[in-house]
């Protein structure tokens, strides 16, 4: 892990652990409905102040909390055009399989690459520390995966260029 990644991930972990103090809260508008307040935004008193944790200007996490849900949006580092394309394709692949990841949203928040929605039902069914570990592990692995894919693409491009230039 790089020197800047460890404090960044520990700050995200601590903030997520604090934000995941969720409780069941029925809708104030419709009887017998329970919707994530962070998505619905029906009343301001149920929403917490959003927290942004940045590693640099392009790599950041937005944690929006409410009384019964937390939305975690992640912007993955994209240093060049190849990383942008790889990140976009990889995130699209993940979001197409959102039903397999219970907390993954199909559509990310504007300005971010991927979003997770954790409701009070998720914290009742799963361990809170395991949810936090999943998000942190996802952030670690996505960085590694995109770096590995970029190396693979560059190696393949080098081989193709060498084969092409053999003809001249």
Curated annotation (Swiss-Prot):
<dbReference type="GO" id="GO:0005829">
    <property type="term" value="C:cytosol"/>
</dbReference>
<comment type="similarity">
    <text>Belongs to the ARPC4 family.</text>
</comment>
<dbReference type="InterPro" id="IPR034666">
    <property type="entry name" value="ARPC2/4"/>
</dbReference>
<keyword id="KW-0009">Actin-binding</keyword>
<dbReference type="GO" id="GO:0005634">
    <property type="term" value="C:nucleus"/>
</dbReference>
<keyword id="KW-0539">Nucleus</keyword>
<dbReference type="Pfam" id="PF05856">
    <property type="entry name" value="ARPC4"/>
</dbReference>
<dbReference type="GO" id="GO:0035861">
    <property type="term" value="C:site of double-strand break"/>
</dbReference>
<dbReference type="GO" id="GO:0030041">
    <property type="term" value="P:actin filament polymerization"/>
</dbReference>
<dbReference type="GO" id="GO:0042995">
    <property type="term" value="C:cell projection"/>
</dbReference>
<keyword id="KW-0966">Cell projection</keyword>
<dbReference type="InterPro" id="IPR008384">
    <property type="entry name" value="ARPC4"/>
</dbReference>
<feature type="modified residue" description="N-acetylthreonine">
    <location>
        <position position="2"/>
    </location>
</feature>
<keyword id="KW-0206">Cytoskeleton</keyword>
<dbReference type="GO" id="GO:0034314">
    <property type="term" value="P:Arp2/3 complex-mediated actin nucleation"/>
</dbReference>
<dbReference type="GO" id="GO:0005885">
    <property type="term" value="C:Arp2/3 protein complex"/>
</dbReference>
<comment type="function">
    <text>Actin-binding component of the Arp2/3 complex, a multiprotein complex that mediates actin polymerization upon stimulation by nucleation-promoting factor (NPF). The Arp2/3 complex mediates the formation of branched actin networks in the cytoplasm, providing the force for cell motility. In addition to its role in the cytoplasmic cytoskeleton, the Arp2/3 complex also promotes actin polymerization in the nucleus, thereby regulating gene transcription and repair of damaged DNA.</text>
</comment>
<comment type="subunit">
    <text>Component of the Arp2/3 complex composed of ACTR2/ARP2, ACTR3/ARP3, ARPC1B/p41-ARC, ARPC2/p34-ARC, ARPC3/p21-ARC, ARPC4/p20-ARC and ARPC5/p16-ARC.</text>
</comment>
<keyword id="KW-0963">Cytoplasm</keyword>
<keyword id="KW-0007">Acetylation</keyword>
<protein>
    <recommendedName>
        <fullName>Actin-related protein 2/3 complex subunit 4</fullName>
    </recommendedName>
</protein>
<dbReference type="GO" id="GO:0051015">
    <property type="term" value="F:actin filament binding"/>
</dbReference>
